[in-house]
Amino acid sequence: MPRALKTNSPTDLGTAHCRNHAYGMWVDYRTVQEALRQRTGLVVCNMRGNHADSRHIHRLWSASGEYCVVGGVRVTTPACTAAVCANSMPFMPAMEVMCWALRNGTSSTEIIACATREGLMNANARNVFRFATPFAENGGEARALAAMILCGFAPPAQQVEFVDPQTGKRYRVDFLWRTRDGRIVVVELDGLVKYRDPQMMDGRTLGGVIDDERERSDGLKRAGVDVIVRIRMDDLYVLEGLKQRLARVGVPLRRR
């Protein structure tokens, strides 16, 4: 698709999803499926073009026209790509893109400047800019962070390290909160791939992987963690159920 657009219109700088994949940004498959179902693309163009919108293509005019070339295709810069996605995508997938950009060296200042310059500031973009962090290590963690924000919980600390006093092993947790009564609550995102992908299993049997997870939980408890909640990707699509689970263990709500 981006190559076709490049051929037909030299002013087009690529569609949102094509830009994301060109950079390797995090976009979950359900978001891509929905975009394909709608059969509509958002294309960023510079101001020299005179092409109107069509049934399947909506053009967003760019004042700067800044772009990079990836694989022979012109695409918007990472900062402007994140800004466009924050403006036009739902909160959860927009958070995935924004967290990717921050983790890979694009500054929030640069992204916000692009959004301001291009007139992309709206309520969704402001929320994305407020809550996105560079600490998510993959798209699943970015989506989990977004889900917990949508549930109304306070932003968690991320990638906090604990040392097991018994074994000396170090463990980093995905998400952490400290409750008012002093307890430490940890949420870990479990991907089924770790139980299926031979590379992630690292030569271990399924039983060995499960034993390692149990050892990790025991080590975290010895290091001072009071509650460990394990969630899966499917939980991120049933927000009411996720909210109830985390509320039961005392995860603090966000102050409005």
Question: Predicted regions span which residues?
Answer:
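Surface segments flanking catalytic/ligand-binding clefts of nucleic-acid enzymes
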Residues: 102-256
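Short gly/ser-rich loop at a beta-strand->alpha-helix junction or flexible surface loop bordering the NTP-binding
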Residues: 1-121, 128, 254-256
